[in-house]
Amino acid sequence: MSFLPLLALLLGVQVAISDLYARRVSNRALLLASAAAVAWLCVQWAVTRTGAPTAHVLGAVAGLVALLPFYAIGWMGAGDVKYFAVLGLLLGWTALLPVWIIASLCAGGHALCIYAVRRVRPMIPLRLQFLRDTTLQHLEHHPAADQIRRARQGRVGIPFAAYLSLGALLWVVRNTYAVSP
């Protein structure tokens, strides 16, 4: 496995954990990964005159341009947009559509589950509702729940960056270990 897909996987793990835990994507991690990718692409191109960085630069621009409208209308966080642009830089523009499709399907499934739970909740028998409420009250006062609540600082929503990480992981594994016909 080459350096850039490996870097994409490592960044994906960090982003997924951060997004699931705090609903936040670290600018520092994105900047470090971008700097490492640009340095790697420049050195590779200067030394071997192969692997022109065009596909990677186009990937970064396409990733930013593709998701920026969703940020502008409030459907997505800025961290998701920046992370998608960095994925474009790391993996090239050809990875963006499959990664986006996988992430969107996962996020759509997540949204459908939330919607279904809200619709089914009134149909639950009262005894089960009481048990659920009691369990949630116990979990709500657990130190880990308090820590997560403090880390999120009121941020809610679907962890799209975590789903982008999953899409990137699947794309890298498929392109690295796929059997050619």
Regions found by a protein language model. Give the residues of each.
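A membrane-topology feature that recognizes alpha-helical transmembrane segments
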Residues: 1-181
